[in-house]
């Protein structure tokens, strides 16, 4: 009996973790478009994947805007006359992009499309897709700006501001 019981106890201890399953969420993003394009994120003409928003004080309502472009790498895509940029992040709120991974409280990121069909359109939870172009003139670079902004009704405290969002560009 002891010979049978010992292996059973050992196997139960070793494999007990396999019975409890973890769940999670996977986000998918893509685009169906008339032209496939390589897109770079540029700040001041330099390719960057991180937008440095600088600093603001707890007395400030907003930080300075930092302009950045989504830049197509082919002439065919630079000549497109209409398109859409879709943004995806678990951090989008009604006012912008939450400080998802930073330590500061009461601050979010205001993300604004500059040369969109409706100029200076903010990207929020309720508006994650932005249209560009008039169907006649070339769009060129897709221009955006971002800044830190104090969240209404919350106390702004010192700390870091770190968040992320994914984009997809679809030309029509």
Question: Regions from the language model: what does each represent?
Answer:
Residues 2-8:
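Sec-dependent signal peptide recognition
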Residues 16-18:
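N-terminal signal peptide c-region/cleavage motif recognized by signal peptidases
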Residues 20-172:
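Mature extracellular/passenger domains of Gram-negative fimbrial/pilin and adhesin proteins
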